[in-house]
Amino acid sequence: MSNVSSEDGIAPETQLIIDDPDVQQIDADEDLLDDVPDDVDCVELIQSRIQSMASLGLERFKNLQSLCLRQNQIKKIESVPETLTELDLYDNLIVRIENLDNVKNLTYLDLSFNNIKTIRNINHLKGLENLFFVQNRIRRIENLEGLDRLTNLELGGNKIRVIENLDTLVNLEKLWVGKNKITKFENFEKLQKLSLLSIQSNRITQFENLACLSHCLRELYVSHNGLTSFSGIEVLENLEILDVSNNMIKHLSYLAGLKNLVELWASNNELSSFQEIEDELSGLKKLETVYFEGNPLQKTNPAVYRNKVRLCLPQLRQIDATIIPKTSKQFP
């Protein structure tokens, strides 16, 4: 099973996979699973034009652990086997989260690409580790209390304006809230295990309220926002990957203290000074990759741009998409 943000899934020894866009709509008297043994532990019915979960007769699969019904026409969550640990309903027509009361062993739930407006009826799923709501119509982060085993939460592509109500997610490691309407970094105080924050394509204008993540945050993706300065980023002393592409940043000030930085993605900003690259970044001995393409310093010096960056930062292994050979002293 896969999702928008992760390649992880399960591969049980016994499973059924049907992926056929030409399969006709399933009616109550027309069950694709009639010939499937009762003891399978994984069923995948993808692009099968299924409209009703009830018509599948899933109750006879007493050992079913993983159910994937991606890219169908399901409007209602129902008849969910209580033995499930993974449920994938990505890309259906679901408008409401319901009928999960008895599915208490779920560790993975994907409801991405549906029509859900409100997060509800899931805080009893105490074992959830991965939860996905990509591309729905959700306006508010709420009703997640009790999900203290959750490590990965994906809320990208919704209508969320505020990061809130995450205090009980004390084991959260990855938070994805890209492509929303968020204007501010806030309410991270309780997320003491957060190592990755993706907040791309929002309305962020400054780095703020991040000191509480200084010891844990390793990856920060904040491209396509309204940032004009790195001020406030200096508190993230353990940051390893920083993506600020497609903002309006003019200077590299405040980066000199990020001693653990390995990758800096800063394409399509307003950076113009090679001297700043040397002054601010030459002390970052772990820095291996930089992206400066699309900045004035590249557009006004296209022929010598990469060589000048390499002279400023001889430790680099990659400039933009170009890998630097270990024996190379300059670009051709």
UniProtKB/Swiss-Prot annotation:
LRR repeats lie at residues 63-82, 83-104, 105-126, 127-148, 149-170, 171-192, 193-214, 216-237, 238-259, 260-281. Its main location: nucleus. GO terms for biological process: cell division; positive regulation of mitotic metaphase/anaphase transition; positive regulation of mitotic sister chromatid separation; signaling. InterPro entries: Cilia_flagella_integrity, Leu-rich_rpt, Leu-rich_rpt_4, Leu-rich_rpt_typical-subtyp, LRR_dom_sf, U2A'_phosphoprotein32A_C. GO terms for cellular component: cytoplasm; cytosol; nucleus; PTW/PP1 phosphatase complex. Residues 295-332 form the LRRCT domain. One of its GO terms (molecular function) is protein phosphatase activator activity. Phosphorylated. It holds the Pfam family LRR_4. It comes from the Eukaryota. Belongs to the SDS22 family. Physically interacts with the dis2 and sds21 phosphatases. Essential for the mitotic metaphase/anaphase transition. Positively modulates protein phosphatase-1, possibly by forming a repeating helical rod that is capable of enhancing a PP1-dependent dephosphorylation activity. This is Protein phosphatase 1 regulatory subunit SDS22. It comes from Schizosaccharomyces pombe (strain 972 / ATCC 24843). The lineage of its organism: Eukaryota, Fungi, Dikarya, Ascomycota, Taphrinomycotina.
